[in-house]
């Protein structure tokens, strides 16, 4: 008798370089779980109870979404491009990038048996770590809250804005989250990673679009 194994799915834009599986996945004995790193510009959906999703957020935001009954969930990691970049002429173009980041995550959960009305949503990040006058992090936090309100999707938990980067550990099957605010000494590496990501999305408009169903 064949048994179906829980499956997982990672999606990323073409601008994100592939990384060796050993970089993305590792056994974390502290949690007795397989840790899966979610990098900027990516989302990952799983129904594997052994997997824990991990990301580090500075100005970026992450939505952690699951259907507790279908036992499927995932995480994304994104920031909005600045309007006026070569690929983004208006603020509405910039918002479209955020819309697609959210819709792709939600749709991947729905096609795996999730139901919109059962979704449990937790959001994190949006810190003002780049010390920009544009306050990029808070703009990202505003977006994710406004998007979910417009879609009538309630937020079960949030830890947004502030001035420090965060490490998020998310267990999609149980909904458990462990969050750690990182010391300022660790901030430089986070900012460097996000600046690289920001420079890529400024010149690469998101491919395609998505609609919730």
UniProtKB/Swiss-Prot annotation:
EC number assigned by the record: 3.5.1.44
Disulfide pairings: none
Organism of origin: Rhodopseudomonas palustris (strain BisA53)
CDD domains on file: CheD
Designated name of the protein: Probable chemoreceptor glutamine deamidase CheD
Pfam families for this protein: CheD
Basic residues biased stretches: 1-12
One GO BP: chemotaxis
EC class: hydrolase
Alphabetical list of InterPro entries matching this protein: CheD-like_sf, Chemorcpt_Glu_NH3ase_CheD, Cytotoxic_necrot_fac-like_cat
Keyword Hydrolase part of the UniProt annotation: yes
NCBIfam families: PRK13487.1
Family: Belongs to the CheD family.
Enzymatic reactions: L-glutaminyl-[protein] + H2O = L-glutamyl-[protein] + NH4(+)
UniProt-recorded Gene Ontology molecular function terms: protein-glutamine glutaminase activity
HAMAP family in alphabetical order: CheD
Annotated segments matching region Disordered: 1-25
Job of this protein: Probably deamidates glutamine residues to glutamate on methyl-accepting chemotaxis receptors (MCPs), playing an important role in chemotaxis.
Keyword terms of this UniProt record: Chemotaxis, Hydrolase
């Amino acid at each position: 008798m064949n048994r179906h194994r829980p499956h997982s799915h990672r999606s990323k834009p073409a601008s994100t370089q592939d990384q060796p599986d050993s970089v993305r996945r590792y056994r974390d004995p502290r949690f007795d779980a397989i840790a899966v790193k979610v990098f900027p510009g990516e989302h990952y959906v799983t129904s594997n109870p052994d997997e824990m999703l991990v990301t580090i957020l500075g100005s970026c935001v992450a939505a952690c979404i699951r259907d507790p009954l279908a036992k499927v969930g995932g995480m994304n990691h994104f920031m909005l491009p600045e309007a006026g970049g070569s690929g983004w002429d208006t603020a509405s173009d910039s918002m479209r990038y955020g819309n697609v980041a959210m819709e792709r995550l939600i749709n991947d959960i729905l096609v795996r048996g999730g139901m919109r009305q059962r979704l449990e949503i937790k959001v994190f990040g949006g810190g003002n770590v780049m010390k920009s006058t544009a306050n990029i992090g808070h703009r990202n936090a505003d977006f994710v809250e406004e998007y979910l309100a417009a879609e009538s999707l309630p937020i079960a938990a949030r830890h947004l804005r502030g001035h420090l980067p965060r490490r998020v550990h998310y267990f999609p099957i149980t909904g458990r989250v462990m969050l750690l605010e990182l010391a300022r000494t660790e901030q430089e590496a986070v900012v460097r990673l996000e600046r690289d990501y920001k420079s890529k999305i400024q010149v690469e408009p998101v491919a395609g679009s998505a609609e919730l169903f």
